[in-house]
Amino acid sequence: AGRFDGRVRVNVLEIAGGSDLAERFQQSGTATAAPGTVMVIDEGNAGHLKVSDAAYDTKVAGIVSGAGDVQAGLTLEQEGVLEGDLTVAIAGRVYAQCEAHSGSIQPGDLLTTSSVAGHCMKATERTLAAGAIIGKAMTGLKSGQGLVLVLVSLQ
């Protein structure tokens, strides 16, 4: 491990310690944001995120990294300016808390926020889904609640 102050340039960089691209954020609200929790932009606190609690929320921002023992591969932060305690995946593969009450989730399904706090669900209403997609399911969930591997690709 090391710390470099200044510019580092490489031709190829392979990261073998995780599989998502994350940023650190400050969290608003009192809800617990455990690994796998779906987060949305907090309109009342610039730059902060809060636990999602509404279906088809266009403020969807990412998923807290670390669920299913999959850690962030690369974490971005600007010390003293844009920093926080919550590591949130904004791209790549990460496990998310999902619910299948609106329909079973299959690999390839588009996912959006759910009314169940901190969870995502299968996007079945295409008109509501525009701008509210967090990514695509890579594993399934037939019923109930559980972890689903998600390819995060905000849309």
Regions found by a protein language model. Name each.
Residues 1-155:
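Extracellular receptor-binding modules and their adjoining Ser/Thr/Gly/Asp/Asn-rich linkers
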